[in-house]
C-alpha cells in the first residue's frame, strides 16, 4: 500500500493530465468513420474454414448489410471504455486529493505544496521555515497516515462489494 501512495504522490501531475486528456477524448468523441469501418471489414481475412462460394460480391453484400451495426457497436464499446477509465481515474484522484487535504497542520500544508504545487524541497523549506530533514519526516509520516486511511477505504469497498 505504501508503494501505491508513493506512486500517487509521484504521478499526481501525470494523472491529472491523463484525466484532462480522457475528458477531451470523451467531449470530442467521433468514433470510427463509415469508410474506416468498411475498409476494416473488406480487408480482414475470414476466420475458420475457407469455403468460397461466390467471390467478392458475397463479401460486399455482407459488408453492406452489417457495417453500420458493427460500427455503432465498436464506437459504443470504445466510448464506454473511455468513460470507465475517466470515472475510475477521477475517483482515484478525488480520493487522493481529499486524503492529502485532510492531513493536519504544517504537515498538511507541506504535503499540499509538495504534491499540488510541485514545490521543490528547497522551496518548501524556505516557505515553511523548516529543514529538509523535517520535510522528509513529514512526508514519511503523511504516507504512513495515508496507508491507514487507504487500507480502511479498501476494506470498506471490499465489504460493500461482498454484501
PLM segments and residue spans:
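N-terminal interaction/assembly modules
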Residues: 1-99, 148-163
Amino acid at each position: 500500500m505504501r508503494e501505491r501512495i508513493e506512486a500517487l504522490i509521484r504521478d499526481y501531475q501525470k494523472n491529472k493530465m491523463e484525466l484532462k486528456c480522457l475528458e477531451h477524448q470523451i467531449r470530442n468523441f467521433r468514433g470510427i468513420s463509415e469508410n474506416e469501418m468498411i475498409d476494416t471489414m473488406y480487408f480482414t481475412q475470414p476466420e475458420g474454414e475457407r469455403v468460397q462460394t461466390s467471390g467478392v460480391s458475397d463479401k460486399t453484400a455482407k459488408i453492406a448489410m452489417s457495417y453500420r451495426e458493427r460500427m455503432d457497436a465498436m464506437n459504443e464499446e470504445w466510448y464506454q471504455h473511455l468513460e470507465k477509465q475517466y470515472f475510475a481515474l477521477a475517483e482515484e484522484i478525488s480520493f487522493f486529493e481529499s486524503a492529502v487535504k485532510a492531513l493536519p497542520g504544517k504537515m498538511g500544508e507541506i504535503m499540499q505544496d509538495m504534491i499540488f504545487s510541485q514545490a521543490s524541497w528547497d522551496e518548501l523549506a524556505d516557505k515553511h521555515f523548516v529543514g529538509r530533514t523535517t520535510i522528509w519526516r513529514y512526508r514519511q509520516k503523511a504516507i504512513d497516515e495515508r496507508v491507514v486511511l487507504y487500507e480502511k477505504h479498501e476494506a470498506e469497498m471490499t465489504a460493500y462489494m461482498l454484501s
